[in-house]
Amino acid sequence: MYAFYSLLIYIFYSLFRRDGGAAAAAEPGDPAQRARKPRGRRRPDLPAPELWTELTGLAASSEPEDGSEGAAEGRAAAVSLEEALLRLAEFLSVQLGAEESCGGPADLGQSGEVPSLLTVTSQLLALLAWLRSPRGRQALLQGTQPAPRVRPPSPDGSTSQEESPSHFTAVPGEPLGDETQGQQPLQLEEDQRAWQRLEQLILGQLEELKQQLEQQEEELGRLRLGVGATDSEKRVQHLTLENEALKQSLSLMRDLLLHWGPGPPIRAPQEEAEALLELQGRLQEAQDTTEALRAQLGVQEVQLQGLQGALQQLQQETEQNCRRELQQMHGQLAGLRARMASLRQGCGDLRGLVSTFTQSCQGSLSEARGQVSWALGALSSGGPGTQLPEGQQGPPAGCPGRLPELKGNIRVLCRLRPGTSSSLVSVEPGPGGTVTTCYRGRHRRFRLDWVFPPDASQEEVFRELEPAVLSCLRGYSVCIFTYGQTGTGKTYSMEGPPEDPGIVPRALQSLFREMGAGRQHRVTLSMVEIYNEAVRDLLAPGPPERLAVRQGPEGQGGIQVAGLTHWDVPNLETLHQMLKLGRSNRATAATAMNQRSSRSHALVTLTLRAASPPRAPGTAGTLHLVDLAGSERARKAGAAGPPRGDPDGARRLREAQTINRSLLALGGVMAALRAHRPHVPFRDSQLTRLLQPALGPGTTAVLLLQVGAGAGQVCACRSPPTRARPPAPLARRSPRGRRISGRQSAPSSSPTEWVKWSWGQPGAAGSRAPPGRLLPSAPTLRSPGPPAPLRRPLAVLHAPVPTTARARLSRPQRACPSSPGSRPCPWGLRPGLCWQRR
């Protein structure tokens, strides 16, 4: 908008300063004149085309008579016209500033919407153009009053003229024509009518400006009643600017009327004084209103600052409260998670106890049926009064159901490698034998279930393990594994050469021989190795792949290996071929201690399912044969600090570290089982996870400890922190579930005398079964002499139920009337089947 008004003023100023001769020469129809017209499309901020046409016509009508006179008159008129245009520009700038503060000026480019200010300006410029026209100059040259000083007609219809102080005189030597003198009255009348119209128009504009001023004052009064401090201040500023613009407009109009129009009417001094006082009063009132609004604005700003401070404080308090509540919720969530974990653990323990109790009851029932069947057969064949031959403590070998009894659910045997120095290790061979080690001047003595001398044969070792192997035909789970340092003969004891087979070939031969004596079983074989904590199938058709070990579904229990192949074995020859295939796929390597060292743990699992009476269909026994990799020191094995770029040395070091960690985890499991801890860390390694079914409740584990000839190997077997603790002092259990100290041995290998001795030991009455171990009771066999008195009734033992599991029991708790001093059974068993000391 500023550019538009500035351009308009510049055009008017240039139009009236043009040389008179050039203006006269430029005709409307001149080609040069038409060539100078602007081309292209019109700018949107320019006035309407009709206004441009009117201004162009006014400019063309101003033609001086000659060059000299036009120059002289142009200079005289330029001074007053420039002053008027400067005032007009000042007024327009103030007016535009007020309009922009209100929200922007109106669009002048729209057709038919020419502002009234431009109309007044065009009329004023038309008057100026008439003064510069030949007729106006003739009037000036004739000595008449200029057009700006023409008075409007009087009320009686006559016109009067006033001489300006600076009137022009006629130029000497220039005569006036008769025609000009004749047209003078007509011209004066036309000028008088034009001045009257102009005066009326200007007075109308003044009235409009006054009305706008009154409207702005009314708007200012309404603004005083407003509530918003910021809007009031903006409105005051806007009204102030608009008031200034109106004052400038009024002053400009007055100056134009005083300079170009008729003189203002003479007012009395008293009226002027009253008007001045009224204006001063209005000004004072406006100033007072402004000050009041400013004071109100300051008060509201103070209130706003206070509210902002309160809001900030409230936000901080709310944020702190939310954070505190969030922390409390996190704490409660952590507590709920821990409680949920404990509840899940208690539920799992309870399920394990229920499953174990069910299995033990089924085993006891099956065993009792077999014994009853054998007793009935013996009585029917021998008649009444038949007694067993001297030296025979059980049913003969050919009778169905005749199997050697177990001597405990955890048994530890020790075998010395030939060539062991007697200065380092001294033994007392036989059942309940002792092993005494001497290392760095310190002697330690271990008592084990059985100690084999260095010259013991493979047959002697297997003869002691045969009862445990054959017990899997009655539905038991048996695990036999060897433990020792690298080079102590573990693989030799388990496999053995073809001419002198070890435990595995002899156990398989004994099982198939026993099954061939009239029993029908289905034999399933699986073989895996644990290499660097990776479980691989050694009997898979393709290359060995890593298998995933998972917990079995709820209600079934056990450990499941996804993708493991199970093979049905029809005969012994096929079984040996498959075992040979599995051994060839096992990871072995040469170390500084052994030419062919096993670098992984091998686990052979045989599952035997009975399919004919007297065993019910579905009864299954499991035999786990484990060949553990030897524990070793990295320095002695040649794997300590391998040089860079030696992949074999780095691989040996990693294998040794993994083997030692898994054996240490196995030692932790054994220690937990020995101490009857409620939690057994089976998940510490893949080895213990796979052995969890073999080391759980109702199973039998036989550990064959291999001791080498060197001093370092003796040290490895007796250093518990860094190696798997040798389970020599582990407690073993009788066939009826009684716990017997590992440091005391039975006086004889006879099952009858061993059972009598175990139940008659002084410290046996105070022992308790480990948590979760419910073992089946074995029948009491007759002996030539009277048995030792029992310290407590022969019954199924159970461990204290965990608190989380006890809370979930819904069965009624009853006390056993036959055992005074007893407390209610958490399992809700009927009287006489449960006994528990306070």
From Swiss-Prot:
Keywords: ATP-binding, Coiled coil, Cytoplasm, Cytoskeleton, Microtubule, Motor protein, Nucleotide-binding. The keyword Nucleotide-binding applies. InterPro entries: Kinesin-like_fam (IPR027640), Kinesin_motor_CS (IPR019821), Kinesin_motor_dom (IPR001752), Kinesin_motor_dom_sf (IPR036961), P-loop_NTPase (IPR027417). The keyword Oxidoreductase does not apply. ATP binds at residues 484-491. May play a role in microtubule-dependent retrograde axonal transport. May function as the motor for the transport of multivesicular body (MVB)-like organelles in dendrites. This is Kinesin-like protein KIFC2. It comes from Homo sapiens.
